[in-house]
């Protein structure tokens, strides 16, 4: 077993080391429990592997909220999720944690969140226009750049964890249960993210990954949306998942990545990987999706779906890509139309112009 070559995030690598220990040391965190009686469950919204989610009413102010009742899981994991949510509170497009209480019956913790109209992206995102795809991905990138700048990787970016209130064009990144603090040189568990959104680093068991994992997942969402193919990489298990990726990005390119980081491939891949050439993105375009595809969309996609995590666009770089020019232009226009004009600040307009 050779040692894999270490890797370090291209951005925000040292943010946690520049903060006091309390910021990232979630195991020492002491939870401030709120009052459970303040919340009344209204209806069940869904259930996940680790929790059940309800719509509720905060009876102190009559406002709707969302209650996530956690299933029995290690205290450490619960503390991690709470600490991360506390650290990110108020961040752009990050779901707001309002309180943490104990369920009186089960004694399990329940997280109280702001209420978001419960359409997850999954139901919506195969029906969006070209402009809407750009708009919502830009909003999602704001959330990712924010959490990365705060030293946190989400590690479960997928449509199901992106809540959209389409009427108000509001987006929230939810479910921080797999999120983790980034410390350069640390080895992380590769059993994170959902199969179709797992980066190659997870599938080849490379543990020294970073924020760039989230950018692969975002790339999978983009591909799925512009090509109207859900999911884009449809593996039947984690091994097949890498094969599906290799059929698009190429096997030669995969081996270059493995060589660069001295990664040894699980022998189980020997019989299933085969040899595949890299495919051009254009080959996924057809009459049903061509209205969503543009040269800049394909260029942007190509900068996200890279084997080498170090080469992938960061969230900030992604936001500066020409794909988002129409959005940036529109958001700039809205900002300037809401602020006083320079003339209004300068008194009478001179007539010499």
Swiss-Prot record:
The lineage of its organism: Eukaryota, Metazoa, Ecdysozoa, Arthropoda, Hexapoda. It comes from Spodoptera frugiperda (Fall armyworm). This is Casein kinase II subunit alpha. Tetramer of two alpha and two beta chains. Residues 39-324 form the Protein kinase domain. SMART domains: S_TKc. The active site is at residue 156. Its EC number is 2.7.11.1. ATP binds at residues 45-53, 68.
């Amino acid at each position: 077993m050779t040692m894999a070559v270490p890797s370090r995030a291209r951005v925000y690598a040292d943010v946690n080391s520049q903060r006091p220990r309390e910021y990232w040391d979630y195991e020492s965190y002491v939870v401030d429990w709120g009052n459970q009686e303040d919340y009344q469950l209204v209806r069940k919204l869904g259930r996940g592997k680790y929790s059940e989610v309800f719509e509720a009413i905060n009876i102190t102010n009559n406002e709707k909220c969302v209650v996530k009742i956690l299933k029995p899981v290690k205290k450490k994991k619960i503390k991690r999720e709470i600490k991360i949510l506390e650290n990110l509170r108020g961040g752009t497009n990050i779901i707001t944690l309002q309180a943490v209480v104990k369920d009186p019956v089960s004694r399990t913790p329940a997280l109280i969140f702001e209420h978001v109209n419960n359409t997850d992206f999954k139901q919506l995102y195969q029906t969006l226009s070209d402009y809407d795809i750009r708009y919502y991905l830009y909003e999602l990138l704001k959330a990712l750049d924010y959490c990365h700048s705060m030293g946190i990787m989400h590690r479960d970016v997928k449509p199901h964890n992106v809540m959209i209130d389409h009427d108000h064009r509001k987006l929230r990144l939810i479910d921080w249960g797999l999120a983790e603090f980034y410390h350069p040189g640390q080895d992380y568990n590769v059993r994170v993210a959902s199969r179709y959104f797992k980066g190659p680093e997870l599938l080849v068991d490379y543990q020294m990954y970073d924020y760039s994992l989230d950018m692969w997942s975002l790339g999978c969402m983009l591909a799925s949306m512009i090509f109207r193919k859900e999911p884009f990489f449809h593996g039947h298990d984690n091994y097949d998942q890498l094969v599906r990726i290799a059929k698009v990005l190429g096997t030669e390119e995969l081996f270059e990545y493995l060589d660069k980081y001295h990664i040894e491939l699980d022998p189980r891949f020997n019989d299933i990987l085969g040899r595949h050439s890299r495919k051009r993105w254009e080959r996924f375009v057809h009459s049903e999706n061509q209205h969503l595809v543009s040269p800049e969309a394909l260029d942007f996609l190509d900068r996200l779906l890279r084997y080498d995590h170090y080469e992938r666009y960061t969230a900030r770089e992604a936001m500066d890509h020409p794909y988002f020019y129409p959005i940036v232009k529109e958001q700039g226009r809205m900002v300037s139309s809401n602020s006083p004009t320079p003339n209004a600040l300068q008194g009478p307009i001179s007539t010499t112009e």
